[in-house]
Amino acid sequence: MAEEEHVDFEGGEAGASLTFPMQCSALRKNGHVVIKGRPCKIVDMSTSKTGKHGHAKVHIVALDIFNGRKYEDMSPSTHNMDVPVVKRDEYQLVNIDDGYLNLMTTDGTTKDDVRLPEGELGNEIEEGFDEGRDLIITVVSAMGEETALACRDAPSS
């Protein structure tokens, strides 16, 4: 008898792809796309007319969702481009420990692998935590990376 292989389907991302293909002509402003291997949010799109030899081209300007860097790409409208699977989750801030956020989901599980962001958002999170405010942190994840994107005060109960 052959040994049965045990596959764990409990996790929501068991074997799930980090991206999916989409035709350039179907991409939209404020949507997401992968440019030069980075997950980006589309901020501007334009289409050039069909030339004498070839297809209409789509010019995409997008910002990296993690570092804000600007990327541009030009591709025939009939070609496929990768679109990242982008997930946004909200967590309650429990603690800040050694540059990392200790977060808790609504069902009580903890998450402590999100780095405290640098700059204005990081300062806002630290100040709010030091003042003893209950903060809700929005975490965005795509293509194996994740970062804190925003924070707000938790609704008082």
From Swiss-Prot:
Residues recorded as bearing Hypusine in the entry: 52
Annotated CDD domains: S1_eIF5A
GO cellular component: cytosol; nucleolus; nucleus; protein-containing complex
Extra information: There are two genes for eIF-5A in S.pombe.
Organism listed in the record: Schizosaccharomyces pombe (strain 972 / ATCC 24843) (Fission yeast)
Similarity-based family: Belongs to the eIF-5A family.
Positions bearing Phosphoserine: 75, 77
Chain's gene name: tif51a
GO annotation, biological process: cytoplasmic translational elongation; cytoplasmic translational termination; positive regulation of translational elongation; positive regulation of translational termination; translational elongation
Source taxon at top rank: Eukaryota
Keywords from the named record: Cytoplasm, Elongation factor, Hypusine, Phosphoprotein, Protein biosynthesis, RNA-binding
Modified residues (Phosphothreonine): 78
Post-translational modification note: Lys-52 undergoes hypusination, a unique post-translational modification that consists in the addition of a butylamino group from spermidine to lysine side chain, leading to the formation of the unusual amino acid hypusine. eIF-5As are the only known proteins to undergo this modification, which is essential for their function.
Subcellular location: Cytoplasm
GO MF annotations in UniProt: ribosome binding; RNA binding; translation elongation factor activity; translation termination factor activity
Gene3D superfamilies per the UniProt record, alphabetical: 2.30.30.30, Nucleic acid-binding proteins
Name of the protein: Eukaryotic translation initiation factor 5A-1
Reported function: Translation factor that promotes translation elongation and termination, particularly upon ribosome stalling at specific amino acid sequence contexts. Binds between the exit (E) and peptidyl (P) site of the ribosome and promotes rescue of stalled ribosome: specifically required for efficient translation of polyproline-containing peptides as well as other motifs that stall the ribosome. Acts as a ribosome quality control (RQC) cofactor by joining the RQC complex to facilitate peptidyl transfer during CAT tailing step.
